[in-house]
Structure formats: structure tokens, C-alpha cells
Amino acid sequence: MEPETRNRDRLKYTSLMKNLVLLLFILCVATTVDSQPAAKDFHSYSNPQDVRVRHLDLDWDVSFDKKILQGVAVLTIARLNKQAPLILDTRHLNIDKVEASATGSGYAATKFSVGQADAILGAPLTIQLPDNAKFVRITYSTNPDASGLQWLAPAQTAGKKNPFMFTQSEAIHARSWIPLQDTPQVRVTYTARVRTPRNLLAVMSAENEPNTPHDGDYSFRMPQAVPSYLIALAVGDLSFRSLGRRTGVYAEPVVVDKAANEFSDTEKMVEATERLYGPYRWGRYDLLVLPPSFPYGGMENPRLTFATPTVLAGDKSLVSLVAHELAHSWSGNLVTNATWRDFWLNEGFTVYLERRILEAVYGRSREEMEAALGLRDLRDDLARLEDKDEILHIDLTGRDPDEGSSDVPYEKGALFLRHLEQTFGRSRFDRFLRSYFDHFAFQSITTDQFLDYLKTNLLNENPSLAAQVPVDEWINQPGIPRNAPNPTSSAFSKVEEQAKRWLRGEISASAIPTAKWTTQEWVHFLRSLPLPRDKAETQFNTGNTTGTPAASDAGSRTASPNRTTATSPGRNDLDNSVVVLDHQRMAELDQAFHLTQSENSEIAFQWLLMSIRIRYEPAYPRLEEFLVSIGRRKFIKPLYEELAKTPEGKERALAIYRRARPTYHPISVAAIDEVLKWK
């Protein structure tokens, strides 16, 4: 055989073997998933116990004029119950035609019906299956108001020249743009063909080719099986910059260089996580910086994290977002919550991993600051939540799963894992986590499955240590156990001392040594300042103005004898001997540090929140600009809530919201509509 011929045959053989390995991998994953007992998912109409979707082939035309996706979804199915129909989740989809086939060709029309719509769940699409049907083809289009899509005019983008569209599928919004089994219990592989205006680029949570020509016709393949909420699409005027051998960033041309500089440590983060928890199993890890209306800080879409531009601080101080979304490549994407009441399995693990990544890349001090801020966030949330919403294994029956997205699954979940780490030792707990990710890789699991694995592979090894961790209290009870870890930061102690000196009049604001402060130190400084208390705060936090948990609550809540409760968002971290912050002192800080005009989103948010409470009017124009220019729910919801506490504030909030509402994502609109009782 000639060398050239041998090389061609070798390449063919290699390609064939790769495809066989991929097929075997998908079959193994499918078999493993089917072997797990199905948990009831109250947020899906689908029936995967009878008919399970294995693979999707998607084909869309993207119409910016009509604000719709129009095309076809072909579903490859496994018939576990030959008598059962296929039931899919939809929300405001226009179903034109449904066909079935035994072979993937020669499709014939089959009967289908769309059931009555529910405000939260959408409507079931029930499809009658012929005896030998293995493929279902659905011709459909989306609605211009689809909750999982946002269509942006050029004026809403950084470049101001081209429109932009992006999806947000978590928790149950995939059904608004794809007819599918919209439950995290079902994992699918997929391909897609996307046609767009020729000058725009389409990217997906799939294999993206960084150097693909912008020709308006794009093809994608996702070989790893993912749940529906991790299917993602974006279309816009995008450029790419490489960050490392398998990492990069997409963004609008006027943003991409700034984003590349901000995220330049991404490859280091991937390597650090692999050293801790095993190989990265998704091929490439890229980021996409979206326009500012994106409702979240980030979304962990596999292979392509969607990120808010509000983290582009210029000093890498907010890249904990990257660490968080990267960590999801292990916790959430690799091992997934089976239902949305198990959400803490995604987010609590991810916050814990995020801080371990930050420590590995930036040092222990950074981790300590992030953990201390996280504990503060958790305590603030616990001050306002009902007991039923303080539970990790939360009951969301009859509720929108987005309602479970407080700091509880994130910070309480991470604190529970920190408790396990501190009790059993970091080295032992790291080995446990690595084995956990390997054991449940590419599966969706319940809280009970995790607890069984925890008992068998960690707790039972040392009953005396296990007795120190009240697992049931962490998982099923409100509040925080009394022996929970209490993360502290020596850097924050120094910040508090400077705040005290200024408030006591020992130094002027301009003399506070802030030159080397990080964003985290600035945020802690502002949070530690004593603010006037509103009525709601007094109800929850009578007599407690320290940074420690209140021993008991007055008013509507009573502390359980075995747990700590929380102080309110307005509390300070200083002692009672300092004065309450007022308009004059706000003005002094503003003059010294120009906080009203801060371009750092975290600092600006905290300052504006304080300005509303103190009625610091010089910040009001910036407040309006902030609320109109970004749609990140983490920032805008608390600001509207604070405004709505007074009649004049609510009037201001409504005036701003009238301007901002058309630019917000549907997820943010739903949240603010509720805050302001918008009609």
C-alpha cells in the first residue's frame, strides 16, 4: 500500500473509530440514566418514563423582522411503553404540522393536540405515535413574546449597528422556543442548522468553530447529552479572541478586546479545576459576552458560557462569575439536579467549587472575602424569606421554579459543603467530590441519591465526625445550623476599622487608605456602614446592629432553638457606638471617591441602594441611568424593591420602569412586574 493511500485509510479508520466511541458513549449514558428511578417533576408535562427523547435535530430561520424562530425539530425517541403517546412541553408555540417515521425518512402526518395552557407550565403537546415510530418531526414557529428569547434592537447593543438575539432556557423556558421534554431528568444530544442575516454570527451551546465565515448559514453539533435548559443560541455581530489552547471569548467587536483582557485567566481556571476535580469533559470552554439586558450574571451553557457585560470591571475583580460558570462544567452540567427542588445540587456545589477555583488562582485572601460576602448575602436573604423558602430541598409544587432562586440554594448549599470539608478535612473531601463527579457523570440525580452516596462514601467512614454535621438540618430545615462555619476575612477587619475611624471623625473620607482596595473590600466597606432602618427591618432585627446573627427575631418570626437566624439587608457590621450614615456623610464619601459615577457595577449597585435608603438625591440621575441601561435581575430587583418602600420612591420607580420595561428580558420583566404590581 502506498504511503498516501495508507494515510487516507488511517484517517478514515480514525474518524470511524471516533464516531463509534461517541455512539457507545451516548448509549452508555442513556442506559445509565434509564437505570435511575425517575423523580416526579412537577414542572413538566412530559412522560419520559414512557417515551424518552434521545436526540434533537433542529433547523431554524431566524427572523429579526418578525422576532421569531421558524423551522423544524426532529426528535429521536425511545419507546419504553409502546401504547403511550409522546407528551412534550410547549409555551406559546405555533405548531403547524407533526409527522412520524420509523426510519427518519418517509414521514407521515400523525395526530396531535395542544392542551390547555397554564400560566407557569405552558401547554402539553400530545402526539399519537404509530406502532413503529422512532422519529417525530415538528414544524413550528415561536411567538414574538417567547419567554426564552430576547430580541434586541441595534440601539440596545454595544455597537449600535446590528440587532441581537439570545436565549435563556433555565429553568423552564426552553419550551418557549423548542417543543421538547423540558425537564432536567432528560438529557439529549443535538444538531442544529441556523440561518441568519449574512452579516451576523450564530453561536450555540455546542461545538463552535471560532474562525467560521459569517455567511448566514451555520451548523452545530453537541455530542454530549445535556438537559433542555442547557440548550442555547445567540445571534449577533460577534468577534472572537483566543484566551488559551481551548478557551476563548465571543463579544461584539467594540467589547471583545476588553472582555479578552478581563477573562485572560480563564485557561488557568480550567487547569486549576482539573487538578482538583478531574478532567474537563466538554472540549472547548468559551464565553459569550451579551448585551446588558441579559437577566443574569452568567448562564452555564456547556462549551459556551453566556455572561453579562457588568462583570467587565477592568481589574479582574469580578471574574468570580467565570469561576462560577466554569465550575458548572462539573456541578450542574456533568451532574445535574433531577428536578428544580434539587436546584441546590447545581448551585450549592458550584459556589463551593467557584471559591476553591478562586483560591487556587488568586490566593486564600480572595476566597475568604468572597465567602464572607456570600455569608452576608445568605443572612440578608434569610431575613426576608419565609421558613419554607429557607430549606435546601425546597418544595416548589405549584410554583414557578424561578421562585426558588434565592441565595439559599447557592450560599446555604455551599456552606453545607464547607462544613463537610472542615469536618472531614479538605484532602478527604476533595477525593469524595472527585469520585462523586465521576460516579454520576452525565446523569441527573435527586437530593436523596446524593445523600445516599454521601452516607456510603463519606459519612459512614467516620461516624464520630459525621455526628458533627447535622445533615438533615442542613437539607430539610430552615435557617443555618448553629455549628455552621463562619467564614471571615482579615482584609475585611481592616476595612471595618477604617470605617469606624471615619465615622468617629478621627479621619476624613479622603484619608481612608483605599488605593489598594479590591471590589470586594469596597463592597464590604459600603455594606458595613450603619444605615437608617425602615419599618420592615425593625420588625426583623430589633436590637441587633452587629454583623452577627440575631439570637431571636421579634415580630413575625421566632428563632428555632437549634439554628441561627439572620439580620436584615439594612444592618451594619460595625458596633453601636458609631453614628448612622446621613446625607452629609454620603456627600463626603461621594466627593472623595466619586461613587455615584462608579463604573464598577457591584460598587455602583451598593452605593445606589444606600442612596435610596438615605434619599441622597445627587445619585438619583445615576440611579435612573443604571436601571435603564442594564437588566441584570440581581441589581435591578433590589433597587426597585427599595424604591417601592415609600410612596414617593414607588412613584419614581414606576416612572423609571415605564422607560426601562421594553428593554428588559421577559424574566426580569416578570420579577419587576411583581415588585411594582405592574398592570
Language-model-derived ranges and their functions:
Residues S406-V408, K412, A441-I445, L459-N544, ...:
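Long, ordered, helix-rich scaffold segments
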Residues L88, L152-A153, S205-N208, D342-F343, ...:
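Composition- and surface-driven signal marking solvent-exposed, interaction-prone regions
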Residues V21-A30:
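Bacterial N-terminal signal peptides
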Residues M17, V72, T103-G106, F220, ...:
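Hydrophobic alpha-helical and helix-loop surface patches within well-folded domains
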Residues M1-R10, A554-R557:
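Short, basic, low-complexity termini and linkers enriched in Ser/Thr/Gly/Pro
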Residues V33-R284, D407, F424:
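Acidic/His-enriched low-complexity segments
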Residues K12, M17-L20:
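Positively charged n-region of N-terminal signal peptides that target proteins for export
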